[in-house]
Amino acid sequence: NSYLDNVDIKSKQEGGSYFENILAIGEAAMQYTASLQGTPVDKTKWLMYPYTVNACYSATENDITFPAAILQPPMYDVNASYEENLGAIGYVIAHEITHAFDNNGAKFDENGNAADWWTKEDYAEFEKRCEKLVYFYDGQEGIPGVTMDGRLTLSENVSDQGAVQCITEVVSRLENPDYKKLYRS
């Protein structure tokens, strides 16, 4: 039984419009989500379709989703070197794991509940480091003519930095690491 079963979609001939139908679907989705408040999390529901080439972390579920479609070239290739796969899919995995500890994920415990689990000292140091990232990225030109707001991009910047640090440390343990392949993949 889908939350869409009760959505009244109207064709143009019935006086409906694409915009109104999208609003009705969005409203039904919000009502469905609100109805889940206080119920156990259904771990069988995925946040993405298997054919989506992406990945995501959900702090409220403490869950990482890697759809099957991401496990193909160029993100993962059985014929690629260890460094190339680490620089591609390894980076994505490390990035999503780091979201559990970014400025948003840091506010949730291992069960996905909003909780203050840091020591005061650790959280103060974490915030200090986050401010450095905000300062670094603030005003950077992401694309020509468009500057970034370091505060708005903080979550992604923390996860990017964590992922780069992670894959760099892993590849540094190899006997003859090929950093060029790692960073170009």
Regions found by a protein language model. Name each.
Residues 1-185:
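Intrinsically disordered, low-complexity linker/terminal regions across diverse proteins
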